[in-house]
Amino acid sequence: MEQLQAALGWDNDHLYMFQVGQTTWGEADPEWDGDDIPEDKTSLIEMLEDTGVRSFKYLYDFGDGWEHKIRIGKVANAVQGQLYPQVTSIEGRCPPEDIGGPPGYAYFLEVMADKQHPEYDEMMEIHGEPFDPNDIEADQIPERIKYFSQWLKKSKAKKSKLKIVKS
């Protein structure tokens, strides 16, 4: 999971869900009474192996509604010393968190492309730097994966043992 978040560029600030065929799996949302399989009951790898699918959807930040279609490429034997999974291609840069979903991102790009836009200075203050949607920042992915791996180890150690059971 942390490798996927890092590759996509998200900060892991929101709930997420995977959709493999008609089955959904992900982080439990206490406000949602859906049929999602809780993330602690199976793994994405197990779901993919059980269904045999070659692509799946990754839904992130239910409020903004980001939907990613992820295709599984060539599956080969592991090579000693290589880190897996590997990102083989990326199209475009990840939008900033909490930008308002696809419509908000489109507006953000419009504003950031025009330094004369009345909201340019405000967007620059919020984002903190110029934004190039074509700069995928591939050089940052290994560092992001390392960061998320360390962060998740710490956060999982602090999780409560309490489990929510549907009745």
Residue spans for each PLM region:
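Short linear regulatory motifs enriched in tryptophan with gly/pro/ser
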Residues: 1-167
